[in-house]
Amino acid sequence: TRAARRIGAPGLGADDRARYLAAIDGLAYGDNPGEGLVRGRRFLHPGLSIAFEVPDAFAIENTRNAVLGTTPEGSRRLLFDQVEASGDRSLEDVLRATWNDAIEAGSVENRIVGGRSVATALSRGKDWTFRLAVIRVGETTFRMIMAAKGSTDPDGAFRRWTESLSAIDPAEARTLRPLRLVVVTAGAGETVEAVAQRMVVPDKPVERFLVLNGLERGASLRGGQPYKVVVE
């Protein structure tokens, strides 16, 4: 961030730096619980009372309009969002109306997952293969899309993902809080990698730690100096 990079810039004295770090210590960071939270491979939305877990290797991000996910090499991606649909409209109709490409003939399946009605389908594009689902939870309809590069059908991972959609336990919902920025002191000889492992982030903790602290790759930490990390 701009503020993070400014900390290490010439002209910012030790007193100013100390005051800045004291001011941000404990500040909320990242997602607002009211808009959903990412915790590792889980997404939790107390307001909608839903949660799900993505398959191994996926890292997810909660954006304004959707939850997006990708694998490190980018060969698989996913999207979760909410769609407008009246309760009397069939899920198959909703699925077809919210997908612009062709749906493979005979691939639409209506089933019950976790007590909820679900319509799923397969769509094949030129470069990607898509698994689609529309799920009704109470009065709200959600869409889940998983894409795999090439002709590989991601059905196995897709089913595990859709089957993970569940209601949030009320007790867990009450405990959800935003992540926080905290200031920690590096020990003598402690490395960037060691301190970065304290970060509660969905992926790339080292890269995120470097950006947060205005450091370049390959930088060494100074024992006794304060650094910012993200924690629960």
Located regions from the model:
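Short, well-ordered beta-strand elements
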Residues: 79-82, 139-150
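Secretory pathway targeting signatures of secreted, lumenal, and periplasmic proteins
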Residues: 51-98, 123
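Stable alpha-helical elements in mature extracytoplasmic
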Residues: 3, 16, 20, 90-95, ...
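Extracellular LysM carbohydrate-binding repeats and other cell-envelope/extracellular binding modules
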Residues: 204-232
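Surface-exposed amphipathic alpha-helical segments
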Residues: 60, 144-181
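C-terminal capping/extension segments of zinc metalloprotease domains
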Residues: 1-51, 59-68
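Signature of long, low-cysteine stretches enriched in small and polar/charged residues
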Residues: 96-143
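Primarily a LysM-type cell-wall glycan-binding module
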Residues: 172-203, 225
